[in-house]
């Protein structure tokens, strides 16, 4: 039934063993939705901990088996396939361990709409010190006032349907050889998205002020790396 509806925002959240943080985020979304018509999709990576989401009007999809870091691309492909037939003006990807700023949906949409470049493809909404690095595309960020052009994506963003169309609704397989020399590397999904979109000439941006808050809690996929480099939002 919900696939026949038209939405202002479709929010996609991936989660693993964080029932309380997810519940906090879903409550946050409910409090921020105002008059917007919002569809929330939760992709659970086969969590061991018990979730009680009965009070929330969401659609929950559970992966089987657990994909973890090395097969995270498989979970993201599942999200891409699922939203292919969903009619929504905007799509927002969120991790399960963030909270939203006040007036989140209106502010995020406003800044996204203010970017007039024809090659705009996405606006990242989790901003930390990484915006000052070249990251995966060897691009020095450019300051445009309320946002930076950064040319990378780290799976916390707002976009329209063309983002997924350009990627053909598919993340290519990420081989386990990626982690042989460095087991602490990330899933590789954000890196692949960034490199592919940059190569095809599309522009990726970050808000100057983070639209979400991310604390110093333990990472589920990059525990050791997060002890060295924390994700503390601006």
Where are these regions (language model features)?
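Cell-envelope/extracellular polymer assembly enzymes that use nucleotide-activated donors
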Residues: 8-10
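C-terminal catalytic/acceptor-binding lobe
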Residues: 13-14, 18-25, 171-234
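Conserved short acidic donor-positioning loop in nucleotide-sugar-dependent glycosyltransferases
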Residues: 17, 29, 43-48, 67
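Short, acidic, metal-binding catalytic loop of nucleotide-sugar glycosyltransferases
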Residues: 27-37
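Short beta-strand/loop segment that forms part of the nucleotide-sugar
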Residues: 37-46, 62-64
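Active-site-proximal specificity loops/subdomain of glycosyltransferases
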Residues: 49-87
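Short beta-strand-to-loop acidic/aromatic patch adjacent to the donor-nucleotide binding site
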Residues: 89-99
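Conserved catalytic core of nucleotide-sugar-dependent glycosyltransferases
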Residues: 101-178
């Amino acid at each position: 039934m919900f696939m026949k509806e038209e939405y202002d925002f479709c929010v996609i959240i991936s989660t693993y063993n964080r029932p309380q943080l997810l519940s906090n985020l879903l409550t946050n979304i409910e409090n921020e939705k105002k008059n917007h018509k919002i569809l929330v999709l939760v992709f659970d990576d086969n969590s061991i901990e018990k979730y009680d989401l009965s009070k929330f009007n969401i659609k929950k999809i559970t992966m089987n088996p657990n994909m973890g870091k090395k097969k995270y691309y498989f979970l993201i492909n599942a999200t891409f396939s699922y939203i292919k037939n969903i009619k929504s003006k905007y799509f927002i990807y969120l991790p399960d361990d963030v909270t939203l700023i006040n007036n989140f949906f209106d502010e995020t949409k406003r800044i996204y709409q203010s970017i007039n470049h024809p090659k705009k493809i996405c606006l990242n909404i989790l901003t930390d010190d990484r915006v000052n690095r070249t990251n995966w595309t060897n691009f020095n960020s450019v300051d445009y006032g309320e946002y930076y052009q950064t040319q990378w994506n780290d799976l916390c963003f707002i976009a329209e349907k063309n983002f997924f169309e350009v990627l053909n609704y598919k993340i290519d397989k990420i081989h386990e050889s990626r982690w042989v020399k460095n087991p602490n590397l990330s899933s590789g999904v954000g890196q692949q998205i960034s490199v592919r979109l940059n190569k095809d000439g599309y522009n990726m941006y970050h808000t100057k002020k983070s639209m979400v808050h991310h604390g110093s809690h333990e990472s589920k996929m990059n525990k050791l790396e997060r002890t060295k480099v924390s994700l503390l939002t601006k």
